[in-house]
Amino acid sequence: MTLPASPPRYAVIGNPIAHSRSPQIHAMFSAQTGRPLRYERLLAPVDGFLPTVQAFRESGGLGLNVTVPFKLEAYALAEARLSERARLAGAVNTLSWRDGAWHGCNTDGVGLVNDLLRLGVALAGARVLLVGAGGAARGVLQPLAAAGCARIHIVNRTAARAAELAAAWRAAAPRTGTQVSAGALAQAAEPGGWDVAINATASGLQDAAPDLPGGLYAPDALAYDMMYGARPTAFMRQAEADGAARCADGLGMLVGQAAESFHIWHGVRPDPGPVLLALRTELLAAG
């Protein structure tokens, strides 16, 4: 009698990790596509990323989503086998075991772009304000440029960090036709307003908004916060008061980046819509 094969094993690794919705998301993708899998949370010691990954691989693991604080270590692990998106992002959030080695990709920016498109944003020719100059901001520059944005203006509380990110992007990125500039938060204004403003800071964790000037938004503009919750974030409330026509949080980005990881691992692209609806319903019920 032949025993049934165990489903392929995947996980999300981070510290902390108990809050992660990735197992729930990938279970729904599995049911939707008919691709069996085992997906779990891996809590790694802050100084124990590599041993945890090695033990996971030795137990048959084939893929990892990587979250805080390990995206840079994942980049180093897969440095010889990086996708272009990961190279330009400077961080890896998706590891795949292929041909005897770990390969690294970054799906955060694709998740953002796909969610913006789902929301009806015309990114081709768009003027985008990107608030924040950390890893979250860096990770979305290439997909935004590839989507045809005309201009991306990076602003940060420390203006020098925004300038460094813009300079690093211009030095490393292929020619895209996207103008990338930088400044302080107080230099966020644009004549005619921005078509899209994206908050890539963690200000929402303190229920605070970046200290931005008023008058930022063009008619029909969208304000997008990478953070999410049951209620509008402080950035969303600030944007609405400043005249943004629409506001959205980052739950769709979360589901979108997971869908891209699923596609990398399994070769099939799930529909994020039903999963996003289920998570949103759950959030609202809990909030």
UniProtKB/Swiss-Prot annotation:
One of its GO terms (cellular component) is cytosol. PANTHER family: BIFUNCTIONAL 3-DEHYDROQUINATE DEHYDRATASE_SHIKIMATE DEHYDROGENASE, CHLOROPLASTIC, SHIKIMATE DEHYDROGENASE. Keywords: Amino-acid biosynthesis, Aromatic amino acid biosynthesis, NADP, Oxidoreductase. This is Shikimate dehydrogenase (NADP(+)). InterPro entries: Aminoacid_DH-like_N_sf (IPR046346), NAD(P)-bd_dom_sf (IPR036291), SDH_C (IPR041121), Shikimate_DH (IPR011342), Shikimate_DH-bd_N (IPR013708), Shikimate_DH_fam (IPR022893), Shikm_DH/Glu-tRNA_Rdtase (IPR006151). Transmembrane segments: none annotated. CDD domains: NAD_bind_Shikimate_DH (cd01065). It catalyses: shikimate + NADP(+) = 3-dehydroshikimate + NADPH + H(+). Involved in the biosynthesis of the chorismate, which leads to the biosynthesis of aromatic amino acids. Catalyzes the reversible NADPH linked reduction of 3-dehydroshikimate (DHSA) to yield shikimate (SA). NADP(+) binds at E84, G132, A133, G134, G135, A136, N156, R157, T158, A159, A160, R161, M226, G250. Homodimer. It comes from Bordetella bronchiseptica (strain ATCC BAA-588 / NCTC 13252 / RB50) (Alcaligenes bronchisepticus). It is an enzyme of class 1 (oxidoreductase). It holds the Pfam family Shikimate_DH. Belongs to the shikimate dehydrogenase family. The lineage of its organism: Bacteria, Pseudomonadati, Pseudomonadota, Betaproteobacteria, Burkholderiales.
